[in-house]
Amino acid sequence: MARMSTNSTTPLSHIRNFSIVAHIDHGKSTLADRLIQTTGGLAEREMSEQVLDNMDIERERGITIKAQTVRLHYQANNGEKYILNLIDTPGHVDFAYEVSRSLSACEGSLLVVDASQGVEAQTLANVYQAIDNNHEIVTVLNKIDLPAAEPDRIKEQIEEVIGIDASEAVLISAKTGLGIPDVLEAIVHKLPAPKSPGGDKAPLKALLVDSWYDAYLGVMVLVRVIDGVLTKGQTVRMMGTDAKYQVERVGVLTPKMVNIDRLGPGEIGFITASIKEVADTRVGDTITEDKRPTAQALPGFKPAQPVVFCGLFPVDAADFEDLRAAMGKLRLNDASFSFEMESSAALGFGFRCGFLGLLHLEIIQERLEREFDLDLIATAPSVVYKMFMTDGTERELHNPADMPDVVKISEIHEPWIRATILTPDDYLGGILKLCQDRRGIQIELTYVGTRAMLTYDLPLNEVVFDFYDRLKSISKGYASFDYTLTDHREGNLVKMSILVNGEPVDALSMMVHRTAAEKRGRDMCEKLKELIPKHMFKIPIQAAIGGNVIARETISALRKDVTAKCYGGDATRKRKLLDKQKAGKKRMRQFGKVEIPQEAFIAALKMGDE
């Protein structure tokens, strides 16, 4: 690890803390790469595509999951030297929590918009978050080297949709490096310097921006110092958890780790302090000195609440302990992921996990499978329902299999979201129908040029299954979607169970709206009929609500031709053999177990993708 001695803290007027806000795939991480390259943060041989996206899965999917940070040294055209702290934030809706914490550590944002595609749904969500944090915003139009780029039209669109002046937008191509020096100048001259109400003599007050686990150093904590100075050897206290630690090292990321002696007001860097658990470092907490604490903590964040739940089970029961260890390791880096043990009659032992959203679920599952070499089955994703019982109590339901007796429930409330969908108007009809089918309530519909912007209220339950995939297929990939949770509303919801050979399969039970139950049940039974192989006896597959069967399919039995050896002769001989076979099958059906293959589970849970 390199060492850099900086005993004097940088004056506030020469520090700029900024983040980059953009929709997925508009070139945010590539721009970060170019800024690092231009300011000499890494030598040429150390550069790789998307330097700040450390996980393989981030590079492959081309998305940023964990917010990353880097400190750049820049000599401006006016001869002054500046320190620029860039926080690269995720763009996807599930990671909005990571975005909100990163934004509160900065004073300004670069709004990156693809000059060929224009404003997308997540651009809006993240820009509004930046504006809520009182950020100064510099607009950057990327990919202007593409033949399809229309910078003038996109500038008008930004002014119309977001309402910020884009006349002086910086035109760049992050891929070729065109216009990068203009971006650096704009950061220095247009974004404000950080403020420190108390200066470096005041008691220490620092914001905990992020924390991650390093195999050698333990938990590393990313901090933004507001007042006072953070030095090696200091005893610090986390005001939220009241935990005390001695600071072992102080440093900055360039993006390599570089040790320094102290962090002053306005600076962003990392500390390590023999912290064992990432859970001890709550993001958004205030760090202060134990001996001379600050009077007031910073306005705190809310801890991330899991929104979507699903069961994860190892395909091979022997992998259970490995799965537990792997989840513990992931939890070290991702405090928004929660899990607890559960068992299922069909799938054995596993975990009930909570996630921020569907992409978060997919990524955790993929990381478990890839980094820890596990084979997993995920049950149908479900949301958190609030149940008001007849005895006046209130309960939360995370797993449909745990639903109490219907007689004891007076009403069930489900979470609703406010969704923003941007789409070319050619696909508007199909998307309106999709939202209508999913019990959506239209709030508004506006046009921006040839694009329509839809605002809908939708039940989250209808979105977690396959809404995103359907939206993409209807719009041939052009529509973009973003949502925020709004409230819980009463719904006419029922628990639908699937029975195979008279036995309920707990992993396939789900909460559905009463109006959609019959269709959902029929589809599920038909799907399972295709996927479960024939057995030696007849297998009924039923969908039921309570004691009422609402759909049924039957898998016919495999039969051996027992009459093959009878040539001509008496018909009673054949009859006797057939009756004997029938009796055997009946007995078999009583005692036979139906094996449901893994593919059948997975396909049944992916219902509605056709």
From Swiss-Prot:
Pfam families listed in its UniProt record: EFG_C, GTP_EFTU, GTP_EFTU_D2, LepA_C
Q: Where in the cell is it found?
A: Cell inner membrane
- Report the residue ranges that make up the tr-type G domain in this protein: 13-195
Q: Tell me the Gene3D superfamilies matching this sequence.
A: 3.30.70.240, Elongation factor 4, C-terminal domain, Elongation Factor G (Translational Gtpase), domain 3, P-loop containing nucleotide triphosphate hydrolases, Translation factors
Q: How does it sit in the membrane?
A: Peripheral membrane protein
Q: Which UniProt keywords apply?
A: Cell inner membrane, Cell membrane, GTP-binding, Hydrolase, Membrane, Nucleotide-binding, Protein biosynthesis
Principal subcellular localization: membrane
The family annotation for this protein states: Belongs to the TRAFAC class translation factor GTPase superfamily. Classic translation factor GTPase family. LepA subfamily.
Q: Which NCBIfam families does this one have?
A: lepA (TIGR01393), small_GTP (TIGR00231)
| UniProt protein name | Elongation factor 4
Q: Which organism is it from?
A: Rhizobium johnstonii (strain DSM 114642 / LMG 32736 / 3841)
The lineage, from the top, is:
Bacteria, Pseudomonadati, Pseudomonadota, Alphaproteobacteria, Hyphomicrobiales
Q: Which gene encodes it?
A: lepA
